[in-house]
């Protein structure tokens, strides 16, 4: 609003609007992506979920990497298809940053790892009332490999998980 009093002009705002401008840096890419997926629950790939949340927060990959303390190239690989394993500590930081439960970011395989692969393998073996040796023979793997899985010394590969536990 503008008013003139004794040849002196005074200006005062009628309304002050304050809102964050959240627009992704690559607007067209984000627009196409958001048309494909309107909600992260529709996605099965972790890469898509990470990209969706990053676009929602209008961040660059390098900004996300800086916030969670990893190399930008590492984070770029997280958003590429074909990656099987995502370190839990990085996913926990991302979940905290986006204020979502970590389970909503993970796929079935990474949830298997997150919920203690060793315990799950042991429970499945014990539910079938098998010894480690018998269970290893059933799966067609060495006894040492099964022991390492059960004690969380070695991470089971996704291809193995799909073959035996999916």
Name each model-derived stretch.
Residues 25-45, 103-115:
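A detector for short, charged/polar N-terminal pre-domain segments
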Residues 69-85, 110, 141-156:
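Recognition helix of helix-turn-helix/homeodomain-like DNA-binding domains
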Residues 48-67, 119-134:
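Short basic helix-loop element that most often maps to the first helix and adjoining turn
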Residues 89-104, 157-166:
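DNA major-groove recognition helix of helix-turn-helix/homeodomain DNA-binding modules
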Residues 17, 22, 106-129, 134-137, ...:
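Short, charged recognition helix plus adjacent turn
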Residues 50, 64-65, 75-78, 105, ...:
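Conserved hydrophobic/aromatic packing and binding residues within compact polymer-binding modules
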Residues 1-5, 9-11, 15-16, 32:
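Short hydrophobic transmembrane-like helices used for membrane targeting/insertion
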